[in-house]
């Protein structure tokens, strides 16, 4: 069985059946596919024909005599979701992945002036773009998420996906800088409590999968949009 996919970035996974051997043309066995708990509306198709619509958190089973060339397509629809964490912060998720702010990176090789137990030098990475953004309280409401967070997919071919440059999926959202959230001891300062108010204008920010980042903001404080009556 060969698996062709861009999962966990893409919703569709294709399984291609290959029966090895000159005499054996078919093989009967059950194919079991686990449906994640976050997924609503999963479908299973064999050779283009729908065979199952399993519920979330279940296991779909398709038993038959399989032949070389049979194709099983599992589709796992991915919707943007928001969960709440420390200090009422918001975390953006899509399917199995958590998303983080895309932050520009500057890498430097630094000589280690202390004991050489970890080697004579190390790499450090510092931000080249702003990072102290909030999301909007109004945008993370369930009825607003689909409109407020825009998913964009990129075709990266065979490139390694887990880098800042090659992230196959980006999520665009509104953000607003929070001036009082600053660096503390070379790291992002303590998490501000949501909800904050700031006069800074809204900006478009880009979120990418957590695993594509080295520097990251993942738990976003929230601020209100005082210009609108929601």
Language-model features: where?
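C-terminal beta-rich recognition modules with glycine/proline-rich loops and embedded aromatic residues
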Residues: 3-19, 23-25, 55, 75-230
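Non-cytosolic beta-sheet module surface loops
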Residues: 19-21, 34-37, 64
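Solvent-exposed, conformationally flexible loop/turn segments
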Residues: 26, 57, 67-69
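Beta-strand-rich binding/interaction modules
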Residues: 26-46
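Residue-level preference for alpha-helix termini and adjacent loops
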Residues: 28, 37, 65, 96-98
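C-terminal beta-strand-rich structural cap/linker in extracellular carbohydrate-active enzymes
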Residues: 30-32, 62-83
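Solvent-exposed beta-strand/loop surfaces of large extracellular or lumenal domains
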Residues: 39-65, 82-87
């Amino acid at each position: 069985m060969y698996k062709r996919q861009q999962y966990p970035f893409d919703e569709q996974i294709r399984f291609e059946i290959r029966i090895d051997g000159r005499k054996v043309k078919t093989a009967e066995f059950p194919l079991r596919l686990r449906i994640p708990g976050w997924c609503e509306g999963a479908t299973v198709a064999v050779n283009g024909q729908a065979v199952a619509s399993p519920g979330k958190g279940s296991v779909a089973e398709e038993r038959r005599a399989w032949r070389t060339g049979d194709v099983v397509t599992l589709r796992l629809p991915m919707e943007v979701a928001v969960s709440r964490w420390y200090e009422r912060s918001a975390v953006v998720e899509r399917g199995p992945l958590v998303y983080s702010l895309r932050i520009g990176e500057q890498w430097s090789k630094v000589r280690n002036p202390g004991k050489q137990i970890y080697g004579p030098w190390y790499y450090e990475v510092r931000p080249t773009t702003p990072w102290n953004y909030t999301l909007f309280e109004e945008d993370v409401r369930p009825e607003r998420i689909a409109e407020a967070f825009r998913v964009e997919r990129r075709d990266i071919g065979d490139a390694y996906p887990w880098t800042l440059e090659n992230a196959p999926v980006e999520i665009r959202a509104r953000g607003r800088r929070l001036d009082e959230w600053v660096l503390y001891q070379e790291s992002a300062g303590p998490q501000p409590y949501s909800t904050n108010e700031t006069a800074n204008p809204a900006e478009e920010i880009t979120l990418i999968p957590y695993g594509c980042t080295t520097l990251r903001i993942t738990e976003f404080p929230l601020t209100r949009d005082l210009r609108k009556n929601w």
